[in-house]
């Protein structure tokens, strides 16, 4: 994890494997800021959806005890959302470097769509 201080706030950039490990230990909340369509097609199991287009920092859940890690497709939108949170007064915020693309490149599991049925299914990439 890389950390920098921005205007008095701590901004963290997490690698996908770090996010997965912390999420498995119930230490973080993952928020996906992609569109509902992107989320429906594939997403990290357990991630909450808060699309950037409708995002308001004041609507975030409490960070007491669990930091929020934002992610998007590439890391661009999640960084913008994290910056908006810092501007709104959050003192610690994080995003996942490389976004969902990096998550898949790291061969981490996710929920995708079964092309035969259209039903969601957990995808366990192989190395």
Predicted regions and their residues:
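Short, surface-exposed ligand- or partner-binding patches at beta-edge/loop junctions that are enriched
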Residues: 71
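Rhodanese-like catalytic fold shared by cysteine-dependent sulfurtransferases
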Residues: 1-29, 36-67, 76-127
